[in-house]
């Protein structure tokens, strides 16, 4: 049986307390090594950092890498990564790994640029927004997201449970709860509704994560982290932070 090791965080130095001063250093201890924080984490979308070998990535000082559940779900498939021994073995990376939930890609690639809109929204009209929504490839409801593959247009559905199942097969040390991506053009009312949805999804993720941890007891322990949402509104952001 594989040795089980929890992921833990140890605080190092902290700035002197003052309004707006919350900086600190620390160490994240994972089953596959430690990460000194703050840290730059390269993105290996499809289990590879494009143009770089694992040795070259390590030579940059990178301590961990992050891969994407959405893209690995579509190609080559989480079952293949699982059979290879998990995402670290699959990409020949000897160190800590992260996977994101796939939520960002499901919604951003499905809805198009309006879902990942930049800060400047001054040039948009209601007609622009309606036109973008007509052709979007993702639909969100309280249970999950229906979307079409960017590869072949096939239909798929992600729920919190599906995201956890995929990420457990990918086997990263740290994974993220499935959350809803919103935009700066969404109303405050929608942002607040979305925050509640993200909280409910996080609880469902935790329940499924606990179940899969028992089912896959021969695998290294994986740590589940939440995602703070609320866009540019301070109260929803604080609420998410305090309740996740």
Place the predicted regions along the sequence by residue.
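A short secondary-structure junction signal
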Residues: 187-188, 236-238
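Structural beta-sheet core signal
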Residues: 99, 226-228
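Short glycine-rich loop/turn motifs
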Residues: 23-25, 223, 239
């Amino acid at each position: 049986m594989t040795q089980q090791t929890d992921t833990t965080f140890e605080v190092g130095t902290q700035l002197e307390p003052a309004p707006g001063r919350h900086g600190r250093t620390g160490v994240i201890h994972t089953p596959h090594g430690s990460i000194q924080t703050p840290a730059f984490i390269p993105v290996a979308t499809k289990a590879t950092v494009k143009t770089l070998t694992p040795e070259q990535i390590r030579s940059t000082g990178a301590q961990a890498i992050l891969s994407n559940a959405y893209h690995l779900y579509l190609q080559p498939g989480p079952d293949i990564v699982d059979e290879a021994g998990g995402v670290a073995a699959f990409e020949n990376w000897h160190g800590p790994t992260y996977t994101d939930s796939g939520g960002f890609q499901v919604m951003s690639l499905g809805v198009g640029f309006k879902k990942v809109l930049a800060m400047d929204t001054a040039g948009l009209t209601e007609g622009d927004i309606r036109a973008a929504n007509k052709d979007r490839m993702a639909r969100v409801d309280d249970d999950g997201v229906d979307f079409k593959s960017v590869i072949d247009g096939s239909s798929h559905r992600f729920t919190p449970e599906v995201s956890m199942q995929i990420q457990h097969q990918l086997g990263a040390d740290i994974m993220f709860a499935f959350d809803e991506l919103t935009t700066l053009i969404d109303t405050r009312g929608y942002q607040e509704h979305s925050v509640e949805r993200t909280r409910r999804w996080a609880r469902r993720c935790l329940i499924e994560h606990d179940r899969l941890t028992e089912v896959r007891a021969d695998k290294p322990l994986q740590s589940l982290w939440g995602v703070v949402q609320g866009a540019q509104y301070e109260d929803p952001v604080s609420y998410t932070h305090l309740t996740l």
